[in-house]
Amino acid sequence: MAFSQAVSGLNAAATNLDVIGNNIANSATYGFKSGTASFADMFAGSKVGLGVKVAGITQDFTDGTTTNTGRGLDVAISQNGFFRLVDSNGSVFYSRNGQFKLDENRNLVNMQGLQLTGYPATGTPPTIQQGANPTNISIPNTLMAAKTTTTASMQINLNSSDPLPTVTPFSASNADSYNKKGSVTVFDSQGNAHDMSVYFVKTGDNNWQVYTQDSSDPNSIAKTATTLEFNANGTLVDGAMANNIATGAINGAEPATFSLSFLNSMQQNTGANNIVATTQNGYKPGDLVSYQINDDGTVVGNYSNEQTQLLGQIVLANFANNEGLASEGDNVWSATQSSGVALLGTAGTGNFGTLTNGALEASNVDLSKELVNMIVAQRNYQSNAQTIKTQDQILNTLVNLR
């Protein structure tokens, strides 16, 4: 009799419809991977066979389309890799859904509250400790401390045809006693800004005396910093570095002592004296104003003092057999013996995929394909139901024989 075969066919077709329906339902779920039901025949010493059974349900881990969102805490994985997440009990899960937010403790978590893990940033300035044990990534709402200026630079083009100043000796209060005045802003231990005036006084052919004065300190006086010496070609050959330049003391802060470099400065016989560029390595304190995840997985904070600071780096996990992962719901998986242990690393290194900031990986469900599969599964279900109906008619014929 074909009742058992038909019932097994109905059960298999129903399971197939469940899988297809689940795919369609999750066609808009970020990071979702479509499933496929596999079947096998049942055989028990008879060539006729005993029907069909579900051999297993596999998932397709090919990439979904990368969809731009513009949100700073959204990040999409392309090719290999999973985000590594931990729950409050320390259990580890893996996901392809890169939608993250901040919890009440300012930890980066997914929408279910699982904490995103990565390599920590430590030291001053912070650097990523790759290879360390992954830990939760947080974005602390703390003030960035001020940094005292220790080095500064000024690139200047001086006119060799400039006459000597008409007034001697040099006086910062008399513009006729110098040829050019510039400035560079530096910072002390509390982040107080000091406007350091730099004066250039031509003392002879190819020679210029440089003086500095802290214009922010009313008690400051101009001091000799260095003597610039140029060769006949206008190239700076001596005096390129002025050391131990000190600021005044403001608001009880320790004065900053820094070096001032004039490398790449030139002397030419045309054009006005011109300061090309100034730089320095200090800054004032700053509040966190924004943050984002970069394409290399680094989490960066942006501060009101126009500085950035590394806060951590997202770690990715790879497996020898993705299909061996166990689905745990909420769009996460856990490792199994079949999947193998997780291999950890960072985006763009080794066999790990790349990250796209401000984007999410869409579901890899092909709706057109799933709708066709649903029609086929429905016909399969109807055909097995028809087998039962036909078998019933045959039994009725036998019962009615006289």
Swiss-Prot record:
It is found in: Bacterial flagellum basal body. It holds the Pfam family Flg_bb_rod. The keyword Ubl conjugation does not apply. Disulfide bonds: none annotated. Keywords: Bacterial flagellum. GO terms for biological process: bacterial-type flagellum-dependent swarming motility. GO terms for cellular component: bacterial-type flagellum; bacterial-type flagellum basal body; bacterial-type flagellum hook; cytosol. PANTHER family: FLAGELLAR HOOK PROTEIN FLGE (PTHR30435:SF1), FLAGELLAR PROTEIN (PTHR30435). Belongs to the flagella basal body rod proteins family. This is Flagellar hook protein FlgE. It comes from Escherichia coli (strain K12).
